[in-house]
């Protein structure tokens, strides 16, 4: 019971609710999350750290990036999913977050396309590294 109470206290703040909502849409790094939320890196990092510590978020390293996502399993994962389900998605702030999220995903897509265009000829060699 204490684990759930701690998690509930952790999401009792507007920025953390927004992060939980965004991170239910996929994995994002801190830089992307600052763009989506329109907040500073130290502030976003502090919220992410707290939410990961109480078990609402999973984090993993991919190269030099640390990616975050909403935890799916366990009691805190179920709690996070239930809270996201209760959010009023027509809220203007959440709609703005979704617009920025789409922009971040489009930027990712364009960067991947540019990388593969630039490296297509050497792709087999790159994959073998």
Language-model regions: role of each:
Residues 2-3, 74-129:
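Amphipathic alpha-helical dimerization/coiled-coil segments
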Residues 2-43, 49, 64-74:
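N-terminal helix-turn-helix DNA-binding core of bacterial DNA-binding proteins
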């Amino acid at each position: 019971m204490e684990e759930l109470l701690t998690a509930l206290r952790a999401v009792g703040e507007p920025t953390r609710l927004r992060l939980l909502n965004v991170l239910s849409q996929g994995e994002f790094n801190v830089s992307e999350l600052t763009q989506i939320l329109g907040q500073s890196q130290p502030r976003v990092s502090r919220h992410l750290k707290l939410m990961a510590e109480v078990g609402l978020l999973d984090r993993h390293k991919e190269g030099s990036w640390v990616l975050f996502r909403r935890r799916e399993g366990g009691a805190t994962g179920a709690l996070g999913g239930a809270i996201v389900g209760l959010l009023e998605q027509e809220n203007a702030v959440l709609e703005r977050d979704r617009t920025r999220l789409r922009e971040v995903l489009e930027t990712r897509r364009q960067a991947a396309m540019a990388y593969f265009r630039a490296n297509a000829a050497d792709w087999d060699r790159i994959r073998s590294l």
